[in-house]
Regions:
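ABC-family P-loop ATPase nucleotide-binding domains
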Residues: 2, 67, 73-131, 138, ...
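Conserved structural motif at the start of ABC-family nucleotide-binding domains
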Residues: 5, 19-22
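Short coil-to-beta microelement around the adenine-binding A-loop and adjacent beta1/P-loop entry
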Residues: 17-18, 117
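The feature captures the beta-strand-to-loop junction immediately N-terminal to the Walker
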Residues: 36-38
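Helix-to-loop junction immediately C-terminal to a conserved catalytic motif
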Residues: 51
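Catalytic Walker B motif of ABC-type/P-loop ATPase nucleotide-binding domains
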Residues: 147-150
């Protein structure tokens, strides 16, 4: 089976600090990979290079042409003026009766406590943790090949 994403001899440096040095990695469908390390050790950088947010300084990153992927990072925030429903439900392009009867959507919204926040609540009124849950829910309700969490 072909990998969803491949990193081949990838390197990345910020200033004088080399965070990635000749990293090679393949991610297959169904893989669950955890990356651990010290603060400033390159974990987020690896994920950003892996997902195309940042280009590598050297090496190659490739992925399947039809890869459906979501990235939930600590660095990106949601626009304050959007409601929770606009962030999570609208991208699905489903009518209310369709998503409300969708078990996956209901399970994600209930499991992450999103329903308790209120779907019409503006994102700008949410705490940082609530925003992260909304961002995570927006990724998990989609039909994706790969979800990357930072």
């Amino acid at each position: 089976m072909a990998n969803l994403i491949n990193l081949e001899q990838v390197s990345k440096t910020y200033g004088l600090k080399t965070l990635l040095d000749g990293v090679s990695l393949g991610v297959q469908s169904g893989d669950r990979i955890g990356i651990v390390g010290v603060n400033g050790g390159g974990k987020t950088t690896l994920l950003e290079v892996l997902t195309g947010i940042e280009p590598p300084d050297a090496g190659r990153v490739s992925h399947t042409s039809d890869l459906r992927m979501a990235v939930v990072t600590q660095r990106f925030d949601l626009p304050d003026e959007l409601t929770i429903a606009q962030v999570i439900i609208e991208p699905l392009e489903l009518e209310t009766y369709e998503w409300a009867s969708n078990a996956k959507v209901r399970d994600v919204l209930g499991g992450l406590g999103i329903v308790d926040l209120g779907l019409d609540t503006p994102v700008g009124s949410l705490s940082g943790g609530e925003r992260r849950r909304v961002n995570l829910a927006a990724a998990l309700v989609q039909d994706l090949d790969l979800v990357v969490l930072d």
